Regions:
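Glycine- and other small-residue-rich loops at beta-strand/loop junctions that grip anionic moieties
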Residues: 121, 195, 248
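Short beta->alpha connector loops
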Residues: 67-68, 172-175, 197-200, 251-253
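Binuclear metal-dependent hydrolase catalytic cores
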Residues: 13-192, 205, 259-274
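Cap/insert and terminal regions of metallo-dependent hydrolase folds
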Residues: 198-274
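Compositionally biased, low-complexity segments
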Residues: 6-7, 25
Length: 274
């Protein structure tokens, strides 16, 4: 597997960089996001693990790649070889555990030849290699027929990839050294994702005025340090000011309340056009 390298910094405050690109973009093409999986770690509601597929004019990428990601790609007709990058928020299995399956499929089934970028928090190379060895001993040492570039995202620095730009923000969740929220910009459209986290001011920077903010709402009103609940999220929406927001990563407690809440929520297979 390729050597890990840090993300390269860019000039200017990260939020300013993205806003400037949005304003200068003029007419933009449609961005399509499909929820391949929107469930929690425990399969609440029979939902797949977290994985969002984004199709943009310049490329396709995944935001998180939970353990069931490859199954979901097959189910919803997403071609694995078309994926240019996988962006990872944190190193829990329901958010990155599908990467070994994607790599093995690329090597032995889909016969991938195009390079693949994997970008995530510090320690991601070690985590991916360790997961591969745990599930398929020896697999991390196989010479791939395609290049894998593993990048550590540095909080509050922008990282370019084929489809656009991503900026990571450190959030609160017990998952290794660094846990991230992600703000991506593709062709003038901003998609922000909270990852798993309790409330933190970093979410304001990550989600402010995003075209789409995908936010964890694990519980309805039970407050935890490391998971966001719906009531807390709703309280802070004025600070975030997203153009659209969708809740995801819901426990059974939250799923049972959805019909009465009147909010926009993720479902496996749901498509959002931007």
């Amino acid at each position: 597997m390729a050597a890990v390298r840090p993300a390269r910094p860019s000039s200017g405050h990260p939020e300013t960089v993205l806003r400037r690109r949005v304003r200068m973009g003029g007419e933009v093409s449609a961005i399509r996001l499909r929820f391949l999986g929107c469930g929690d770690a425990f399969g609440s509601g029979g939902r797949m693990h977290t994985c969002f597929h984004v199709s943009a004019p310049k490329g396709q990428f995944l935001i998180d790649c939970g353990a069931s990601a490859l199954i979901a790609m097959r189910r919803f007709g997403v071609e694995p070889n078309a994926i240019d990058a996988i962006l990872v928020t944190h190193l829990h299995g329901d958010h990155f555990g599908g990467i070994p399956f994607v790599i093995l499929d690329a090597q032995f089934v889909s016969k991938r030849t195009r390079p693949l970028l994997i970008a995530g928090p510090s320690g991601i190379k070690r985590a991916v290699s360790g997961a591969m060895e745990m599930m398929f001993p020896g697999s991390s040492r196989v010479q791939q027929r395609f290049a894998i570039d593993i990048v550590e995202l540095v909080p509050e620095r922008s990282q370019a990839f084929k489809a656009g730009v991503v900026i990571a923000y450190e959030v609160e969740h017990p998952a290794g050294e660094v846990r991230l929220a992600l703000r991506t910009e593709c062709d003038g459209k901003v998609i922000a994702y909270s990852g798993d986290t309790g409330w933190t001011p970093a979410l304001v920077s990550a989600a402010r005025e995003a075209d789409l903010f995908i936010a964890e709402a694990y519980f309805f009103n039970k407050r935890l340090r490391d998971h966001l609940d719906f009531e807390t999220l709703r309280t802070h929406l004025g600070e975030l000011s997203p153009r659209r927001w969708i809740v995801t990563h819901m426990s059974a407690d939250m799923l049972e309340r959805l019909p009465a809440l009147g909010c926009d929520y993720a479902e496996d297979g749901k498509v959002v056009m931007l």
